[in-house]
Amino acid sequence: MASSVVVALLVLLSLSGLEAIQHAPKIQVYSRHPAENGKPNFLNCYVSGFHPSDIEVDLLKNGKKIEKVEHSDLSFSKDWSFYLLYYTEFTPSEKDEYACRVSHVTFSTPKTVKWDRNI
């Protein structure tokens, strides 16, 4: 009985230590298919390698938040860092600019990464 209590306490202490670890997210913005003006596509923002799990991700069109956005479930890697995919259907054009804005405790201000249609 006493040994199981000690093990439980050690597990709780090690898990509470995970909250102190902070890793900034890596942000990748890309389209599902090569960009063609006027042709429907999907805009993806893959955010990975972050800890803790609290994060805010927005897809932007010309600096304004896109409302109809879907995302994957929050998942974690073997190193206990987290990852997410946010995506939306869009139709690229020469005049529009798309980006992904991420807010996380590791950033003093939100970080915005622009979509490069040539990638």
From Swiss-Prot:
Q: Does the keyword Disulfide bond apply?
A: yes
Q: Which Gene3D superfamilies match?
A: Immunoglobulins (2.60.40.10)
According to its UniProt entry, this protein's organism is Callithrix jacchus (White-tufted-ear marmoset)
Q: Which SMART domains match?
A: IGc1
Alphabetized UniProt keyword annotations = Disulfide bond, Immunity, Immunoglobulin domain, MHC I, Secreted, Signal
**Pfam families to which the protein is assigned, alphabetical:** C1-set
Q: Which residues form the Ig-like C1-type domain?
A: 25-114
A GO BP entry is:
intracellular iron ion homeostasis
UniProt subcellular location: Secreted
GO MF entry, a single one: protein homodimerization activity
Determine if Signal is one of this entry's keywords. Answer: yes
Q: Give me the disulphide-bonded residues.
A: C45-C100
Extract the signal peptide range. 1-20
Q: Which family does it belong to?
A: Belongs to the beta-2-microglobulin family.
GO cellular component terms, A-Z: cytosol; external side of plasma membrane; extracellular region; Golgi apparatus; HFE-transferrin receptor complex; MHC class I peptide loading complex; MHC class I protein complex
Assembly mode = Heterodimer of an alpha chain and a beta chain. Beta-2-microglobulin is the beta-chain of major histocompatibility complex class I molecules.
CDD domains in UniProt? IgC1_beta2m
Q: What does this protein do?
A: Component of the class I major histocompatibility complex (MHC). Involved in the presentation of peptide antigens to the immune system.
* Principal location class: secreted
What's the protein called, per UniProt?
A: Beta-2-microglobulin
